[in-house]
Amino acid sequence: MTPGRTISPATRPRLAGKARLRWDRKDGRFMLLYPERGLVLNATAADVVRLCTGELSVGDIVQRLAAKYAQQPRADLEREVLGFLTRIAERGLLTDDDA
């Protein structure tokens, strides 16, 4: 993803080739791994990363999560997803099909 590029509901994110989502059996948590580093993810963040295939837009991802997490207002969920994706994009962990 181009540095400084804004992620919008129309963006179709996917993990960059250097990033991998893994389940750490020892610690019982998801990790987003990239060269010599890793991020611990909560279940919701792991759901977002799993849906970053390049086929779904951010809007589609939010829609799927809204069905799973019906107790959370969609606007809040969208804001959180956009924020999370922006943060991992800034680390070079996302690419998109619209670039």
Predicted regions and their residues:
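Acidic, low-complexity/disordered tracts enriched in E/D and polar residues
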Residues: 1-50, 90, 95-99
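Long, charge-rich, low-complexity alpha-helical segments
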Residues: 37-99
